[in-house]
Structures are given as C-alpha cells and as structure tokens.
Amino acid sequence: SNASVEDMTYPRATYDECIAFIAKEYEEAAQMLDTERSSIETYKVPTAGAALALESRVLLEAASPWFNGNKYYVDFKRHTDGVHYFNQTYDATKWAKAAAVCKRIIDTGKYALYTVPADSKTPTFPANVSTANFPDGVGGIDPFRSYNDMFTGEESGFNVSEFMWAKEASWDLV
C-alpha cells in the first residue's frame, strides 16, 4: 500500500480493550469448533471447550489484582489522550465474567479433574485435610500424583479424553 506512516499508525489499545478483543475471538472460535473430537486423528484440533478454557484464563488474569486496579501502573498512559493503559479502578465484575465462562465449561459435563487413584505410596495427610471421598476431600485419590502426572506425561494418552497441548511422540533419540 502507498499509505503514509501517519495513516498506518494507530494508538495502542488499553489492556482492557485487548482483553475484550481476545475474549471475543475465543467466543467466536468456540462457536466454530466442534464440542467433541470426531476421531482419534483429530486429536490436534482444539474443541470449543479448549477455546472457552483459554478465554477463562485470559479473563481470570484480567480480574487479578495485578491488572485490576493496580496503582503500580498509574504512569502507564497513552500519550495521545492520557488514558491509562491499565484501569486504575478495581472492577469486581471482571471476576464474575471469568466465573461465567468457567461455569459454561463445567455445565457441558464433558470435563473432569484428572485424578490418580490412591495406593500404598499415597502420603498420609494432616488432620486439617478432609479425608472425605473426592471431590469433597482427598479420599480415594493421590492429589500429588494427580497434579504431577499432568506435567510429566506419566499418564497414557489413551486414558486422557482431551489434549490441550499435544505433540506427536518422537522416538528418534539421535
């Protein structure tokens, strides 16, 4: 294009404007993506639930004290109009927006927390930790291994209903 630099220069968006844009994009993606995988060959294709999960994380970050009314950013202003890049007023509704997206994911009934059954290696927990059966307590599961195995790859892929970040196995060790 032959447009001038001035015509191609736009003021930087605020953090809240960026979050709104990203959330809108994830909403649109969730509408276009399937709610379930049609076959094992499509394991690399994200589902609508994955898009909503990412949207919820973005909204949770925006609701956090780091970006929601944090006075640390008081001097971060757009030079064209003096608007703060980071909103200086705490907004509790940001938490509600994030929670609403999380609730939509829960209400699909398609997802569950990954757990590893308790066994002889499961540690004994302090008295202040409920031993009621999961999800009301730690009864019947090994919370440490349940969390740890999500990151170590210890769980066989055949037992996992959805991969959010997947990579084909490579046995080429050279």
What are these regions (language model features)?
Residues 1-174:
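Structured, solvent-exposed acidic/aromatic patches
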